């Protein structure tokens, strides 16, 4: 079985993340979507909230497991018998960091490959940080996040749309 790990903070999960997962399923038998516990990052949502949002958002996609981990990604991938790390790239600006991480992971374990998928054009500008900022100021984020995320943002920060949606 070809298993890939798709790591991230998913604070919150976006439709761009889901696009990468759906396309990754064409390449792998199983994708483990795993939240990295990073004490250096201040998350808006708790680990449990992020796990719940991911589980709800991915419930209709077969071959996907939701999990979390702390420590080195490559060690986690070994424990899960994964042969690949799946990463999405939005723009050239993502490349340098992702390339360095891929090289380090390859140095630590040559048997685990990093596979990059370019984000679909529809999601190229989307990131969890931008979503949170837009929601904070009442920007319309519908269609950019799963319904459960929109609901949780409303509960967490009082997200209410106060701007008209622009045409795509």
UniProtKB/Swiss-Prot annotation:
GO molecular function: ATP binding; pantetheine-phosphate adenylyltransferase activity
InterPro entries in alphabetical order: Cyt_trans-like, PPAT, Rossmann-like_a/b/a_fold
GO CC terms in record: cytoplasm
Entries under Pfam families matching the protein: CTP_transf_like
Residues that coordinate or bind substrate: 9, 41, 73, 87
Enzyme class: transferase
Its job: Reversibly transfers an adenylyl group from ATP to 4'-phosphopantetheine, yielding dephospho-CoA (dPCoA) and pyrophosphate.
SUBUNIT field: Homohexamer.
Name of the protein described by the UniProt record: Phosphopantetheine adenylyltransferase
